[in-house]
A protein has these predicted regions:
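Generic hydrophobic transmembrane alpha-helix motif, especially the helices
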Residues: 120-156, 163-164
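C-terminal transmembrane helix and the adjacent membrane-cytosol boundary/short C-terminal tail
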Residues: 109, 197, 201, 243-273
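Transmembrane-helix boundary motif in ABC transporter permease subunits
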Residues: 89-119
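Transmembrane alpha-helices
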Residues: 147, 151, 184-216, 244, ...
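Short helix-to-coil transition segments within interhelical loops
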Residues: 125, 165-171, 175-195, 235
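Transmembrane alpha-helical segments of polytopic membrane transport and secretion proteins
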Residues: 1-37, 258-273
């Protein structure tokens, strides 16, 4: 009997190990690079063969040529500078206010009762729908665009910070209080470090939201910016320049996300241990 059990358990372990390799298998980085190159070559081929009109889908080589021309003319530089200014200010303001709101509502029962229902009620509203109202209140200048970005950033940061604070082990807080730690010391040494993973998850969500709101705001209420540039060439049906603007926007989002990942590794070095 023991031998049969041993054989059965060994067979079961072998089956589980084989199934787990499907989930745990890793591939070298060149696989990702090769897949992108193959996709671009296929895209170039169907455009060169005339299967798709360049008006609807320009070839990658045509888009790169348009991008280089726009870079040389300074058109991309001016638009990118305006967009970076708006997204950085909006993201910083929204993140700081969201972080403060999440910490306060997460640590104060009264603030939780007052603030949490308001945040949950306002969160589902599409923020871009409020842009005309902000333009009416704040004018068509930079303030309305920065404010709508800050508002979009505020909610994911506030809600994730709140969840991170609520998920902190109460035993750790009790230990800090038993050693006569002040409220600020408890927040700094116990609550904030344990809530950081959730806070950074909120920041990453907010980064995507801020980019979407930036483009929408620039398309509606801006003369300069990547969103305004894309809309301009869309109206003129100059597709290669439109796609060049989309590529710049994609690279901006990628760099923003990489920066947040780097910042997270610096702030939470123990996360990947």
């Amino acid at each position: 009997m023991p031998e049969k059990k041993t054989a059965a358990s060994a067979a079961n372990e072998y089956i589980v190990r084989n199934r787990m390799t499907h989930w745990q298998k890793t591939y070298p980085h060149w696989v990702s690079v090769a897949s992108i190159i193959i996709l671009l070559l296929f895209w170039e081929a169907i455009c060169r063969c005339g299967l798709v009109s360049s008006l609807f889908l320009p070839a990658p080589s045509q888009i790169i040529s348009a991008l280089l021309t726009m870079l040389a003319d300074g058109e991309i530089g001016v638009s990118l500078a305006a967009s970076i200014y708006r997204i950085l200010i909006g993201f910083a303001v929204g993140s700081l206010i969201g972080l403060a709101a999440g910490l306060v509502t997460g640590t104060s029962a009264l603030a939780d009762k007052i603030g949490n229902p308001i945040v949950n009620a306002l969160y589902p509203i599409p923020k871009i729908a409020l842009l005309p109202l902000f333009i009416l209140w704040l004018g068509i200048g930079e303030l309305s665009k920065v404010t709508i970005i800050a508002l979009g950033v505020f909610f994911p940061v506030a809600m994730n910070t709140y969840s991170g604070v609520k998920n902190v082990d109460t035993l750790l807080i009790k230990v800090a209080v038993s050693f006569n730690a002040s409220w600020w010391k408890t927040m700094k040494s116990v609550v904030l470090p344990n809530a950081l993973p959730m806070i950074f998850a909120g920041l990453r969500l907010a980064a995507g939201t801020s980019l979407l709101l930036l483009v929408a705001a620039e398309m509606i209420a801006a003369q300069v910016g990547i969103g305004a540039l894309i809309l301009h060439y869309g109206d003129l049906m100059i597709t290669d320049r439109l796609m060049a603007g989309v590529i710049v926007l994609s690279l901006l989002g990628l760099l923003f996300n990489l920066f947040l990942q780097w910042l997270e590794r610096k702030a939470i070095p123990w996360k990947n241990i």
